[in-house]
Amino acid sequence: MVASRTSADGGMETSYGFRDVAEGEKQGLVNDVFHKVAKRYDIMNDVMSAGMHRVWKDALIAALNPRKDAGYKVLDVAGGTGDIAFRIIEASRRLAHATVLDINGSMLGVGQERAQKKGLSDNLTFVEANAEALPFEANQFDAYTIAFGIRNVPRIDVALSEAYRVLKRGGRLLVLEFSEVQMPLLDRFYDQWSFKAIPRFGKMITGEAEPYQYLVESIRKFPNQQDFAAMITKAGFSKVSFTNYTGGIAALHSGWKI
């Protein structure tokens, strides 16, 4: 489970894959990973999920069911390439507005290029900022989404508290993330796929194996479904629930600001 802890020298440590690193060091390491894979990020997700991430993202949008009006505002965090935000805008019949926030400029650059090509720029705002210190006043958004990004945040509890702060009363949090497999046979297959196949395919596709190795390890260090639900509740959210997909390979967590 990802959690900050005190190191032998009194500093705060967290997990970077299977390594323990200083809390302040993790963000730079994660940024380097995503600078390397930004232009092939969607291919990376295809490799890591055998294409299933597209189905899971569709399930997130179905759960969100964005309102079809111009006043509906969504904050999509760690959403640099725009994949979730584009789906939200289309599901709202191009009426909603999405703010895409990412700490990585390379990822945002890809998203902005894609938005222009899709003709969605008027519905989108791109912001380079940290999920742990959102540059928005309280009670601004109707929904907060984050897909396959929360496990890369050094202080997940802080990010969840920030999500709660910027949501309006009645606003909804939706977190899609790789999670703990619930089926023993699938678990063994998934381990083999993750640790042996994914880094190899990653190197073939992008020339880089290390980013994929980190991402695989980071999944194993992320809290399981129940523990992450407890973290969301601790941040102040109500009616917290989760839905497993593909035997628990991924899970969608939901919470409300009441």
Curated annotation (Swiss-Prot):
Instruction: Check the record and name the InterPro entries matching this protein.
Output: SAM-dependent_MTases_sf, UbiE/COQ5_MeTrFase, UbiE/COQ5_MeTrFase_CS
Which leading EC class covers this enzyme? transferase
Keywords for this protein: Menaquinone biosynthesis, Methyltransferase, S-adenosyl-L-methionine, Transferase, Ubiquinone biosynthesis
The keyword DNA damage belongs to this UniProt entry's keyword annotation = no
Q: Extract the GO molecular function terms from the UniProt entry.
A: 2-methoxy-6-polyprenyl-1,4-benzoquinol methyltransferase activity; demethylmenaquinone methyltransferase activity
Q: What processes does the entry annotate via GO biological process terms?
A: aerobic respiration; menaquinone biosynthetic process; methylation
User: Pfam family example for this protein?
Assistant: Ubie_methyltran
- PROSITE patterns of this UniProt entry? SAM_MT_UBIE, UBIE_1, UBIE_2
Q: What is its EC number?
A: 2.1.1.163, 2.1.1.201
Determine the domain of life of the protein's source: Bacteria
Positions of S-adenosyl-L-methionine binding = 81, 102, 130-131
Transmembrane segment boundaries: none
Q: Which HAMAP family match?
A: MenG_UbiE_methyltr
User: Family assignment?
Assistant: Belongs to the class I-like SAM-binding methyltransferase superfamily. MenG/UbiE family.
| The protein's role, per its UniProt record | Methyltransferase required for the conversion of demethylmenaquinol (DMKH2) to menaquinol (MKH2) and the conversion of 2-polyprenyl-6-methoxy-1,4-benzoquinol (DDMQH2) to 2-polyprenyl-3-methyl-6-methoxy-1,4-benzoquinol (DMQH2).
The name under which this protein is listed is Ubiquinone/menaquinone biosynthesis C-methyltransferase UbiE
Q: Which organism is it from?
A: Allorhizobium ampelinum (strain ATCC BAA-846 / DSM 112012 / S4)
